[in-house]
Amino acid sequence: MKSAIIGYMAVAVAAASCQFTVDSKNYDLSAISGPKSVEYTIETPPSKRKMEFVLDPCASLKQDKKKPADEQCPDNTIVCGLGYILLPKEKDFVLSEVMPFGNGPAPQYQPLKTGPEGTEGLSTSYGNPWGSEKLDIDVNYICSDKEEGPKLENVGLGLNNYYEINWKTPAACINDGSKPKQPVKEPGKTPNDGDDASNGNPSWGWFTWLFIIIVLGVAVYIIGNAWINYDRYGNAGVDLLPHADSLRDVPYLIRDLIAKVVGTFTGSSRTGYSAV
């Protein structure tokens, strides 16, 4: 049910820090901070049962003051389980169970309990009395290259009132506090692949140099003619600029310059006239 997590998000208080040290290893879960939910629905003829668990990796949950207190977990609950039931001929699920797990300002983490030996990650476990029953839950944050979000492992009625949530995420990997981890290499690329900018290569393309040479050549031509007109003829103002006859020669000068530059790069040795 989305209404439960929306209520917790509305009153969520950010933890002062989402960094934890377990067995002298540092972890930073801030990338997945904030209330998250996971749910499942099972058939319990003639009804249906829906279970939802809300948790925040960085802080405890706060009540929504706009909702009745008995319809939500108490303040500072670490994981809140909510059970709903859909009766025959009814359209909407009705809240039937409120199961708080843990209490405190933030989760208390231990080394990862699941997965192969050496797998990076964290675990948090809680057991609470619930009516005449006792509830237990394990939440495992498992180091992974891919974010998968929280998932319930024992979907069902809860064997012996035990629930387990596994969350595979890059945030659960050990944080050494130094340089960031290298990005995952794309298939078919070598470590030296990439463009000039990513490799720090300051070289420019020959087309850029050609453009710069042309601009400088035109500027020198105009300034040179202006100086000649001023020094030789005493012209001023607009008369300093090259005359119309000179301007008509500019395209041909540029064409010849481009031809020479291209010939230099291509190594062309062709001479003579071109066919008309």
Swiss-Prot record:
Disulfide bonds join C18-C58, C73-C80, C143-C173. The chain crosses the membrane at residues 204-224. It comes from Yarrowia lipolytica (strain CLIB 122 / E 150) (Yeast). It is found in: Cytoplasmic vesicle membrane; Golgi apparatus membrane; Mitochondrion membrane; Preautophagosomal structure membrane. InterPro entries: Autophagy-rel_prot_27, Man6P_isomerase_rcpt-bd_dom_sf, MRH_dom. Residues 16-175 form the MRH domain. One of its GO terms (biological process) is autophagy. This is Autophagy-related protein 27. Residues 16-203 are lumenal. Effector of VPS34 phosphatidylinositol 3-phosphate kinase signaling. Regulates the cytoplasm to vacuole transport (Cvt) vesicle formation. Plays a role in ATG protein retrieval from the pre-autophagosomal structure (PAS) and is especially required for autophagy-dependent cycling of ATG9. The keyword Nucleotide-binding does not apply. Residues 225-276 are cytoplasmic. One of its GO terms (cellular component) is phagophore assembly site membrane. The keyword Hydrolase does not apply. PROSITE patterns: MRH (PS51914). Belongs to the ATG27 family. It is a single-pass type I membrane protein; Single-pass membrane protein. Keywords: Autophagy, Cytoplasmic vesicle, Disulfide bond, Golgi apparatus, Membrane, Mitochondrion, Protein transport, Signal, Transmembrane, Transmembrane helix, Transport. Residues 174-198 are annotated as: Disordered. Residues 1-15 form the signal peptide. It comes from the Eukaryota.
